[in-house]
Amino acid sequence: MAVQQNKVSKSRRNNRRAHDALVAANPNECSNCGELRRPHHVCPSCGHYDDKEIVAQADEIDLDEDAA
């Protein structure tokens, strides 16, 4: 098991932990469909980013008909 060489003061410990905080998600509204999306990411519901369609949305596929 590892053993520390010297005691780490409360100040040094807290300074090291200063960057460990988690930041809450900050979703934005999609300019095309109005759904919430992550900043700087393609909208998962409509596939648009920066008012351009990046990902073409496929039509609904009925899996039961394809299996038969």
Swiss-Prot record:
Keyword Ribonucleoprotein: yes
Gene Ontology CC terms, in alphabetical order: large ribosomal subunit
SUPFAM superfamilies with a match to the protein in the record: Zn-binding ribosomal proteins (SSF57829)
Region called Disordered, residue ranges: 1-20
GO BP term, pick one: translation
Superkingdom as given in the UniProt entry: Bacteria
Keywords attached to this entry: Ribonucleoprotein, Ribosomal protein
InterPro entries, alphabetized: Ribosomal_bL32, Ribosomal_bL32_bact, Ribosomal_zn-bd
Record family assignment: Belongs to the bacterial ribosomal protein bL32 family.
Name this polypeptide is given: Large ribosomal subunit protein bL32
